[in-house]
Amino acid sequence: MPVKFPSLKFEQLKQLVLVAAIAVFCVSCSHVPDLAFNPWQEIALETDSTFADIAFTEDPNHGWLVGTKETIFETTDGGDTWEQKLIDLGEEKASFSAVSFSGNEGWITGKPSILLHTTDGGQTWARIPLSEKLPGAPYSIIALGPQTAEMITDLGAIYKTTNGGKNWKALVEGAVGVARTIQRSTDGRYVAVSARGNFYSTWAPGQTEWTPHNRNSSRRLQTMGYGKDGQLWLLARGGQLQFSTDPDAEEWSDVIAPQDKGSWGLLDLSFRTPEEVWVAGASGNLLMSQDGGQTWAKDTGVEDIPANLYRVVFLSPEKGFVLGQDGILLKYNPSTEVAMVP
């Protein structure tokens, strides 16, 4: 006896086939090419800290790496191996946020109210006392020359010293408020993203106040920074990237989505060369563009790293590092050819 299938089930089957076809089409559209070679070497460090910053002395092989949980590492071979160091801060539980060197003079900032100074490449570190009235906690510092540095707090208060930290001059009258991220350009400008990512502020030398700017889309801002030529860039929630098209930070390029998968969070961006861009993100996500951000490729050699990659730092086109959580550190290997596989 012939079996009759209800028409409803047949319609359901057609819908399932259609959904499957759409899914396959979307996957093919959102595919990001892979890099043929992985130019990053994972450096094994025995710590579960999240790294915040890295800097080198006048000796290109001698560097320092800092992070949470009072973490400080030193290298004397260009970053291939690292030795953990301890600095006695008493009973305070510090979280280091930045390190910077000019020659052999260096500075380290951290919470709560931590500022360290060295004049001998880090053989000895002295703690610089900070006023209890300091607006916010030290967020970052830039060594500018002998006895000279510029420090910014997490509330956007900017100070400069020219005598090794004995005295500080305020460069801005008003704070910006609690900031999510703050970055400085090579010519001394700053951009700060608000704690909730709903607006950003800019400051330039000579200005007395921060200038607030509304974000240009419904997506909350993740972080912002400056490219090699001083051009602003931004990363927004959902894995979106934009570059500024005017010096006033009011006009922006069309949205670029390095990955057409909104679930991937992008956390930092850095230029290796004027055209080669690297973007790091959650769950070992590392992407590269060779044409200034127009097309992208994914470094699948690091995608199995079970950690967020928070910072990409290129000290030169040949020397770069990726800083992550749980003690993850990647070192750029320029001898590895970088090529895209379609």
Curated annotation (Swiss-Prot):
| Subcellular localization, as worded in the UniProt entry | Cellular thylakoid membrane
Principal localization reads membrane
A GO biological process of this protein is: photosystem II assembly
Superkingdom of the source species: Bacteria
Q: Decide whether keyword Magnesium is in the record.
A: no
Q: Which residue numbers carry lipidation of type S-diacylglycerol cysteine?
A: 29
Gene3D superfamilies xrefs: YVTN repeat-like/Quinoprotein amine dehydrogenase
* Record note on modification: The last 3 residues are removed in the mature protein.
**What Pfam families does the entry give?**
PSII_BNR
Q: What is the effect of changing residue 215 to E?
A: No visible phenotype
User: N-palmitoyl cysteine: lipidated where?
Assistant: 29
Q: What result is annotated for mutating residue 29 to A?
A: Almost complete loss of thylakoid targeting, normal autotrophic and photoheterotrophic growth
Q: Which InterPro entries does the entry mention?
A: PSII_CF48-like_dom (IPR028203), WD40/YVTN_repeat-like_dom_sf (IPR015943), Ycf48/Hcf136 (IPR016705)
The leader peptide range reads 1-28
Which GO cellular component does the record give, naming just one?
A: thylakoid lumen
- On whether Kinase is a keyword of this UniProt record, the answer is no
Gene inactivation effect: Grows significantly slower than wild-type, 30-50% reduction in functional PSII, decreased chlorophyll content, significantly reduced replacement of photodamaged D1 (psbA). Grows poorly on low light (40-50 umol photon/m(2)/s) and not on higher light, reduced chlorophyll, increased levels of unassembled D1, substantially reduced levels of chlorophyll precursors.
Provide this UniProt record's keywords sorted from A to Z: Lipoprotein, Membrane, Palmitate, Photosynthesis, Photosystem II, Signal, Thylakoid
Tell me the membrane topology, using the record's own terms: Lipid-anchor
Question: Propeptide positions in this record?
Answer: 340-342
Q: What is known of its domains?
A: Eukaryotic orthologs often have inserts compared to cyanobacteria; insertion of a 19-residue sequence from C.merolae into the same position in this protein (at Val-176) has no visible effect on function. An Arg-rich patch composed of 4 residues on the 'top surface' of blades 4 and 5 is important for binding to assembling PSII centers; mutating each Arg residue individually has no phenotype whereas none of the triple mutants grow in high light (90-130 umol photon/m(2)/s), suggesting more than one residue is involved in binding to the lumenal side of assembling PSII centers.
State the function annotated in the UniProt record.
A factor required for optimal assembly of photosystem II (PSII) which acts in the early stages of PSII assembly. Also plays a role in replacement of photodamaged D1 (psbA). May interact with precursor D1 to prevent its premature processing before association with D2 (psbD). May also play a role in chlorophyll insertion into chlorophyll-binding proteins. Increasing levels of chlorophyll precursors partially suppresses deletion of this protein, supporting the idea that Ycf48 assists YidC in synthesis of chlorophyll-binding proteins.
State the oligomer form and interacting partners.
Part of early PSII assembly complexes which includes D1 (psbA) and PsbI; not found in mature PSII. By two-hybrid analysis in yeast interacts with precursor and intermediate forms of D1, but less with mature D1. Binds to the lumenal side of PSI and PSII complexes. Coimmunoprecipitates with YidC. Purified chlorophyll- and carotenoid-containing photosystem II (PSII) assembly intermediate complex RCII* (iD1, D1, D2, PsbE, PsbF, PsbI, Ycf39, Ycf48, HliC and HliD).
Q: What is this protein called?
A: Photosystem II assembly lipoprotein Ycf48
Which lineage is the organism of this entry classified under, starting from the top rank?
Bacteria, Bacillati, Cyanobacteriota, Cyanophyceae, Synechococcales
| Name of the gene this protein is made from | ycf48
